Amino acid sequence: MNIAKAKPRVFFQGREINFDVVIPRIAATWTFYGAAVVRQFELMGSLSANSSASISRSRDKLRALQLIGNIGVEMPITGYVHLSRDIESVLNTVGEPPFVIKLLEGTQGRGVVLTETMGAAISAIETMKKIDANILIQEFISEANGEDIRAIVVGDEVVASMKRIAKPGEFRSNVHLGGRVEDYKLTDQEKESAIKSAKVLGLSVAGVDLIQSDRGPLVLEVNSSPGLEGIERASGIDVADKIIEYLEKEHLTRDKSKPIDI
């Protein structure tokens, strides 16, 4: 990138590049750099499927849950612990074991541990804190039976959805961990929760993960670069085509005088 007065530029292999529309596909470990590149394209006038600011918001899982919870969307009871001395008190605010312990930097189900007792939870968190990890503590939703739901939001609608089912003996349903997928039709409440969650983060394209509970659907997290292979296979819907159709319309109708969300 070349950051200069009134003339931002992007280069690839020594050649200057520019696009009308960009579709960010950014690995979690590349968030800072990826968001910076998207921001540069936005300053050059490109339309991004998701703004650099919305990508940064969604990748900060704690911030995302704070924003989602603030608009009244249901989610698992969640605690955040910073100091080791506060571990037990935070666990008590979440409830009774078992607890789900999550690394904020984890992806695809990695960095997620189920602890069956208070002692096991404390030990797991203390171990993670030794490497200065940021940790979320969530209630375990036993009635979900190792299943969750992925909804793809594009614009103001859900264009595809699927159910993910964990392999035997595993509580995480991620496909990368051996889970299987099947087509699933969302309820109106699930659709509303998914769309609201994407919108409050400023995302136009998002994968929203939900879990079914005795008190209704709960939002687990929102992904700004959702994988498409599994959901396209399960639903039979060409999600990539839906995204391109949406962006073509947005490109033709957008107001370029509107302030950029950076």
Regions found by a protein language model. Give the residues of each.
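ATP-binding N-terminal substructure of ATP-dependent carboxylate-amine bond-forming enzymes
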Residues: 1-49
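Active-site nucleotide/adenylate-binding loops and adjacent lid/helix of ATP-dependent enzymes
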Residues: 9-11, 15-17, 42-45, 49, ...
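Glycine-rich phosphate/pyrophosphate-binding beta-alpha loops
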Residues: 28, 223-235
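Glycine/Thr-rich phosphate-binding loops of Rossmann-like dinucleotide-binding domains
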Residues: 32, 109, 216
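Protein kinase-like catalytic core scaffold
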Residues: 99, 159-160, 206, 218-220
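Phosphate-binding site of ATP-dependent enzymes
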Residues: 112-201
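Short, conserved loop/turn and helix-capping segments at secondary-structure boundaries
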Residues: 115, 233-238
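A long amphipathic alpha-helix within ATP-dependent nucleotide-binding catalytic cores
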Residues: 131, 170-219, 241-242, 246-261
